[in-house]
């Protein structure tokens, strides 16, 4: 599993996506492209990892985010913490 994550990270870096900035709108599109490429070359490791990341990826008006805190940008986590502190009336 660690090897898959390293390989996908390398692919993302080669394609110009900063590992720390998963909030850009094109991440989901990029993951779909990686998945399609993995299908075409029959690379099951990258296919599995890209599908796993896509399953954790959600989209909203600000772009693509990951449900797991491991992948969610800090600014998004801060917004969620602030929102939790405000009581609903």
From Swiss-Prot:
Q: Which organism is it from?
A: Shigella flexneri
User: What is the name of the protein in this document?
Assistant: Uncharacterized 10.4 kDa protein in spaT 3'region
Query: Which keywords label this protein?
Result: Plasmid
Q: Which domain of life is it from?
A: Bacteria
């Amino acid at each position: 599993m660690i090897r898959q994550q390293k390989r996908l990270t390398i692919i993302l870096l080669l394609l110009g996506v900063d590992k720390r900035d998963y909030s850009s709108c094109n991440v989901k599109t990029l993951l779909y492209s990686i998945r399609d490429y993995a299908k075409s070359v029959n690379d099951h490791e990258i296919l599995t990892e890209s599908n796993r990341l896509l399953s954790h990826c959600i989209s909203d008006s600000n772009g693509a985010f990951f449900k797991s805190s491991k992948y969610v940008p800090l600014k998004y986590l801060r917004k969620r913490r602030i929102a939790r502190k405000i009581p609903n009336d």
